[in-house]
C-alpha cells in the first residue's frame, strides 16, 4: 500500500527532543494546516492540528532551526498510534512520521534562529527504528522502496531542449480560496 502525506503549515510548538538508548534523536511537535474556502459566498477557514515526529539527523536539524510558528513543508507517512492512558482507557491517534522536510522562510515575518530561507532536509532513508517501537508490517515494503530509490534505473542522455524544468510554486498564491487552484 502507498502511504505518503505532504503538508504545509506552521509548527504549533517548539520541537521536543528525546534520545533513544541507541543515541538516535527523536523530535516531536505538531503542525497547523489551514484550508481556506468559500461556502455560501462567505470566506471561511478550517484548521487541522496534526502531531508530527522526526527521527535521526532530521530531528536534530528541526530542533536547531525550527521554532513555534515556523512555516514548514513536511513529507512523511501516516501512522496510527495506540496506547492505554492512566485510567486504563484505550486511546489512539493519527500522526505523521516525517521523512523529508523543507523549511519555508516567511518574507513577511522576522525569522528566529537565523535566515535559513528555503532549505530541504531528508532522513536519508532513516527507518525510525528505536527502542519500544512496535512491529511495523510495512517496514519490509518501505525498505524495498528505499532500496529502489537509492539505486535508480539508468537514464538515457537527453538533450537540454527535451528536459522538463520544474517551476517553483508560490504556496501563498493558493491561499486565497479554492477557485484559484490550477486543477
Swiss-Prot record:
It comes from the Bacteria. SUPFAM superfamilies: Nucleic acid-binding proteins. One of its GO terms (biological process) is DNA replication. InterPro entries: NA-bd_OB-fold, Primosome_PriB/ssb, ssDNA-bd. GO terms for molecular function: single-stranded DNA binding. Residues 111-135 have a biased composition (Low complexity). Residues 108-183 are annotated as: Disordered. Residues 171-183 have a biased composition (Acidic residues). The keyword DNA-binding applies. It holds the Pfam family SSB. GO terms for cellular component: nucleoid. Residues 1-105 form the SSB domain. The keyword Transmembrane does not apply. Residues 161-170 have a biased composition (Basic and acidic residues). Keywords: DNA-binding. Homotetramer. This is Single-stranded DNA-binding protein. It comes from Campylobacter jejuni subsp. jejuni serotype O:2 (strain ATCC 700819 / NCTC 11168).
